[in-house]
Regions:
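Metal-dependent DNA phosphodiester-chemistry modules and their immediately adjacent helices/loops
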Residues: 216-235
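Modules that initiate DNA replication and primer synthesis
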Residues: 2-38, 169-216, 226
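Phosphate-handling DNA/RNA-contact segment within nucleic-acid enzymes
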Residues: 84-184, 200
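General alpha-helical segment detector with a strong preference for membrane-spanning helices
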Residues: 145, 149, 195, 225-228
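TOPRIM metal-binding catalytic domain and adjacent DNA-binding surface shared by DnaG-type primases
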Residues: 1-19, 23-102, 110, 118-135
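A generic structural motif
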Residues: 162-164, 212-221
Length: 235
């Protein structure tokens, strides 16, 4: 199977981030379903490919434009740093089931995403912070959205996000299914676009009937809800 290495804009439908690039060169847009065949050779894109090696150093700070406090970023290990090329990025640090750091997911100002380390070993983002059981857990599409929901609830709720966004929702939820099934309710708060809605439809049947709840919002995602409408709109 090919491995997704990044998401980005789709030239066919204009979606800003639904077009997934895979390591054999093919692309698939989860919004308009456009498939572009690759060459079969490994795809190399500067600042977008999966890279291994020493992890990046970052500084934890408040993300004011996102409405996120330093304390929230510290809790999730979300920092600001730079790629070895010097490109400024935000860095989400991922851990494996044992709690060890195994990968980092980076994002630059142009929404280019890349992995450092071994993303295949990574659990859901924030899974290491969770109790593993309880009344409710919220699953968001992106890391910033997970931080947003967590902060809105005083960083007391269990909140996680998908490592690969909407396109990797089924694989990620299946991998962590036993963990997620430990909760009475699993709330899916994916982006309010076609890719997000499709992702919800693909994963909801994984769970025990009645366990999944779908969060509905008039905004694009949880962070936009927090920034534009405030904490009460999230909670």
């Amino acid at each position: 199977d090919s491995l997704q290495v990044s998401t980005g804009p789709c030239p066919a439908c204009g979606s800003s981030d639904a077009n997934a690039l895979y390591d054999d060169g093919h692309t698939y847009c989860h919004s308009c379903k456009t498939h572009v065949q690759g060459t079969g050779e490994p795809t190399i894109r500067k600042s977008r490919t999966v890279r291994s090696g020493v992890f990046l150093n970052g500084e934890v700070r408040a993300l004011n434009k996102r409405g996120l406090t330093e304390a929230t970023c510290q809790r999730f290990g979300y920092s600001v740093g730079a790629l070895r090329s010097g490109v400024p990025v935000q860095i989400a640090t991922y851990r494996d089931a044992g709690g060890s750091i195994v990968a980092q997911h980076t994002r630059d100002a142009d929404k280019n995403f890349a992995w450092v380390g071994d993303s295949k070993q990574a659990t859901l983002y924030g899974e290491n912070l969770c109790r593993g059981s309880g009344r409710r857990i919220v699953v968001t599409e992106g890391e910033i959205d997970a931080l947003s929901v967590s902060q809105a609830f005083g960083n007391t709720w269990d909140v996680v996000s998908l490592p690969g966004g909407a396109s990797g929702a089924l694989k990620a939820c299946r991998k962590s299914l036993s963990f997620l099934e430990g909760y009475d309710e699993v709330v899916l708060w994916f982006d309010a676009d076609e890719a997000g809605r499709t992702a919800v439809e693909t994963v909801v049947d994984l769970f025990t009937p009645g366990r999944c709840k779908i969060a509905l919002s008039t905004r694009k995602d949880a962070n936009e809800t927090l920034v534009l409408d405030g904490v009460k709109a999230v909670t």
